[in-house]
């Protein structure tokens, strides 16, 4: 008796495409492959389809990338708002800073997307969204007595410091393998968490004295 060939397993169905499905897939793609690798064809391959199918939902690569950036900004806004709720001064600043750092490390591709367009660019919607993302920080700075332009500039300084630290970590320049000068042993390895906490607390101390007549500028 001749045995029948085993039936082939059906191929898993590709997800039904929609704009949300495509954008969510792009976010996942970013963290695995990076911003520069994000193309229509590469994303279509991840979704198990062909590039032209995506054009039914996104008009171009620029449309895709812009929408991804807007989503990332909104994610960061929601994250900062959530962790900052009910907190003030140093407690809020440290919690927000730590959450920002954690987001960048867990979502490196998305973080790269967040920093790819200048705040003063030609896209008013993107600029407005970026300013909105700073709002939770500016709200916390009010607990230090900072408002208006003072609060906005303090928020920019805070963000610049966080971004610089995160970038040094993500590029491998700042890591736990660093040895403090003059120590030269395992005991002298740099505690990057302690460096980060110290930096944030010094920034917070500066905010507390920013409006003092004899305080730090």
Give the positions of each predicted feature.
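N-terminal intrinsically disordered/low-complexity leader segments
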Residues: 1-17, 182, 211-217
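Helix-turn-helix
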Residues: 21, 25, 29-63, 67
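Alpha-helical DNA-contacting segments of helix-turn-helix folds
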Residues: 30, 64-72, 114, 122-133
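A glycine-rich, hydrophobic loop/mini-helix early in the fold
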Residues: 50-52, 56, 64-83, 87
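Hydrophobic alpha-helical connector segments
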Residues: 81-110, 121, 131, 148, ...
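Amphipathic alpha-helical segments used for helix-helix packing
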Residues: 105-122, 167-178
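Amphipathic alpha-helical packing segments from all-alpha helical-bundle domains
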Residues: 120-145, 152-156, 189-205
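Amphipathic C-terminal alpha-helical segment
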Residues: 160-180, 205-213
């Amino acid at each position: 008796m001749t045995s029948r060939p085993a039936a082939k397993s059906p191929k898993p169905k590709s997800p039904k495409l929609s704009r949300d499905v495509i954008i969510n897939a792009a976010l996942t793609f970013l963290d695995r492959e990076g911003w520069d690798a994000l193309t229509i064809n590469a994303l279509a391959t991840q979704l198990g389809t062909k590039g032209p199918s995506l054009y039914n939902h996104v008009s171009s690569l620029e449309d895709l990338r812009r929408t991804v950036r807007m989503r990332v900004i909104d994610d960061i806004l929601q994250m900062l708002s959530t962790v900052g709720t009910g907190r003030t001064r140093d407690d809020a600043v440290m919690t927000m800073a730590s959450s920002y750092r954690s987001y960048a490390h867990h979502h490196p591709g998305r973080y790269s997307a967040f920093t790819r367009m200048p705040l003063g660019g030609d896209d008013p919607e993107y600029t407005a969204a970026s300013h909105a993302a700073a709002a939770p920080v500016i709200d916390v700075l009010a607990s230090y007595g900072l408002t208006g332009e003072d609060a906005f500039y303090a928020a920019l300084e805070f963000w610049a410091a966080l971004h610089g630290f995160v970038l040094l970590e993500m590029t491998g320049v700042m890591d736990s393998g660093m040895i403090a000068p003059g120590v030269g042993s395992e005991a002298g390895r740099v505690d990057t968490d302690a460096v980060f906490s110290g930096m944030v607390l010094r920034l917070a101390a500066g905010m507390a004295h920013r409006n003092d007549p004899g305080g730090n500028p």
